[in-house]
């Protein structure tokens, strides 16, 4: 709908330019937003206020000319001027109702991509191997997964790339420790965190051990068979730990999506050679660097992008450049999204620029760093254990499930006291599992991607507010309507007719699902979908309270309200699925 309004405004601008009301050459960014109060229309634009000065007119006078010039359209009932010159657009209720009927009949809820389908590479999760995943890996994993799901829903071909850290100093450290502990090492490997900490302690405390670790890295990189065999074993165990976390989280990542740093080893020397051939490299204290004038330090000197150390080793930038070239040459990506901590913003700005100057990627290939903030504890600092250690992600998820189970068990006892049929233990465990995992994921996804946030079990497990339990309950409330009806959602007759204010408000929200999904895909911001679903659930609650469904006054009204309820249920479920959340029929 917003795109339609933008097109209508553009047609009006073209007409006013042709008749001399507006000067030629104006290319305004036409903004169309939802109104805060639907009594003032469904959508609003400030285009008249934007162009009043170049037009030499008062905003309201220009707004009046625009209203006259905007073509009639079946989706619009009227356009009004408000305040200092806003244009308020009112949807046609008959058209709106018909569009919702079409959405209900469509398995995709009427959602289509605004633009051609693309091949999109999603770089997500990407933990360093040789130790277990910790809470710091949560955001990249679930935000990337949600955006990947949205893009697939819109028809893009999505290629997930888990760019794991499977190469480097940490493996030399582990190999050296394995030499010292040959008897117990295999057993200790099953608790990678314990094994890694022990090796890191030796590395930090013993210069001899550190030197041996570096020697083993060189042997590993040279292809030593024994080192490669042990390195492979470390990776297998580490990746199996990762897969358990992914399965627990319900994210769409598998071993087939792993494309670690080591996959690009054979191309790193060629990357350096190609940068040299392009004349982009400068030697600085023995290291090979690219200096970009756009990125300077506090003294005004260009910052280096180091691609090869003085000792011959390669860095993250070298691997990232090789990966970009692979993603263009082999994966044929139109767009690459990097879900990496926003503290790496400068790194990505630099390597993106180097890749383009070197010709590793074409100008039309989109490279986007989807940075995110930090998950903090209640004290506002990075989330840690009580003794200051990192929190294993699997431990966090287990605690979430345990807390959720205790919560739903208590509610189940209250259910029995009210004389309602209680859930059995198997059902309670499943409900607790879904509520626990969904709550952790939703609490994160509902925050703006670039914002830091404080992790709080009590808030995220609440059945009030913008939480997973609240939305899960909204889904079960819709499902209960059709259980009482004794009929499936797919068997409904009649058509939607919008009469009451609550029906209109719910319908207007449902109609915006497609625009919303496209916006999430464009910006990589799942919190917009969370906010939409939360508002939708609230509007359904108001509709449910004020507009009797099963006891409606006449059959046509009953059919209409059942259809609105059915579309609401499907939209909630589809939205939660796109976020990577499970839903429940009852809870």
UniProtKB/Swiss-Prot annotation:
A motif ('HIGH' region) lies at residues 127-137. Coiled coil: none annotated. It is found in: Cytoplasm. Keywords: Aminoacyl-tRNA synthetase, ATP-binding, Cytoplasm, Ligase, Nucleotide-binding, Protein biosynthesis. Disulfide bonds: none annotated. It is an enzyme of class 6 (ligase). Pfam families: Arg_tRNA_synt_N, DALR_1, tRNA-synt_1d. Its EC number is 6.1.1.19. One of its GO terms (cellular component) is cytoplasm. One of its GO terms (biological process) is arginyl-tRNA aminoacylation. Gene3D superfamilies: Arginyl tRNA synthetase N-terminal domain, HUPs, Isoleucyl-tRNA Synthetase, Domain 1. It catalyses: tRNA(Arg) + L-arginine + ATP = L-arginyl-tRNA(Arg) + AMP + diphosphate. InterPro entries: aa-tRNA-synth_I_CS, Arg-tRNA-ligase, Arg-tRNA-synth_N, Arg-tRNA-synth_N_sf, ArgRS_core, DALR_anticod-bd, Rossmann-like_a/b/a_fold, tRNAsynth_Ia_anticodon-bd. GO terms for molecular function: arginine-tRNA ligase activity; ATP binding. Monomer. Belongs to the class-I aminoacyl-tRNA synthetase family. This is Arginine--tRNA ligase. It comes from Pseudomonas aeruginosa (strain ATCC 15692 / DSM 22644 / CIP 104116 / JCM 14847 / LMG 12228 / 1C / PRS 101 / PAO1). The lineage of its organism: Bacteria, Pseudomonadati, Pseudomonadota, Gammaproteobacteria, Pseudomonadales. The gene is argS.
